[in-house]
Amino acid sequence: MLETLGVWQGIADEAQPVTEIEITDSSLEAGIRPVLLKYENRLTEDGGSEPASHIVPATALERALQASVASDPVLTVIAPAEIARFTDTGSSVAITLADGTEITAALLVGAEGRRSASRDAAHIKTVGWKYGQTAIVTTIAHERPHNGHAIQHFLPAGPFAILPLPGNRSCLTWTEDADEARRILALDDAGFLAEVDKRVAGRLGAVEVVGPRQSWPLEMHLARAYVAPRYALLGDAAHGVHPIAGQGLNLAFRDVAALSEVIVDAMRLGLDPGSLQTLGRYERWRRFDSFMSAAAFDGLNKLFSNDWLLIRAARDFGLGVVDRLPELKRRLVNEAAGMTGDLPRLFRSERL
């Protein structure tokens, strides 16, 4: 999608291809963490292969998207800005910003994240729950090269992922019990590095924390509706999922591609892009897929964020079986890459 939109070339130099994903399941104290499942490059339809995924710094993605928007003469950026209220007038949506500026449009899209103010103003309720877990993210430099390998350690408190970045650097993202996370985040630099060392387990040689510590509480929420008259939700405003599979951004991209396709198709047919008839197609397309993804990630978190002996034995057996079935692994890699199901045209490298 990013290539089709002409954005990828502004990101490629900072993107790290992931050529292999290793999955382990063990306790924090285990000195040896055997690899139970290994994914390699994703097979393409023409019989070739490409990286299973890419790790892209958020700053690089934001910079490339902002540059693309700034270079388009038909787009007007009003930022920073906050919506005070909006009203469906029947033929348009009347939007009033906090500074009093008034805007009229055919459609308003709520994409401002989990705490979406526009979603609340549209009276769209959500359903969900808190996990009692906290995500911790930082960046490390390390002695040994990662060779483009991503590692997912399933530990009793939750997954610990080592995601490769350009050079001898990696992004760490791990899930901890909320109380334990508070303890870890309050440590001094030496104490925090010791916690990192325990989890990296010598895999990358000597390590150094080179990025800030970031954290946020984990929860799941799903909007009860994705659309209202002249209003549509997408991304985290529509669905907040557990990061166990790292698919939150990819789900948002699918929303963007699907909504764009629905709007363009409607306008080509002379239809109203903000009508419920038009927006209903988007909701039918994306709501069920997002629900199934959220349910799957929720189930994976419950399955792997515990240390029950019987459950561990069963899940390790299951991972071993998957590792021995190449076709199933291929399907799972394509699923993780967001390349299955009813794909929008932008996901098939087709322009709208």
Task: List each model region and its residues.
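Conserved N-terminal helical subregion
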Residues: 11-121, 129-134
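FAD/FMN-dependent oxidoreductases across multiple families
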Residues: 180-276
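Acidic-histidine catalytic/liganding microenvironments
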Residues: 5, 72-73, 325
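Residue-level signal for inorganic ion chemistry
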Residues: 2, 65, 162
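Conserved FAD/dinucleotide-binding core of flavoprotein oxidoreductases
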Residues: 33, 38-47, 155-217
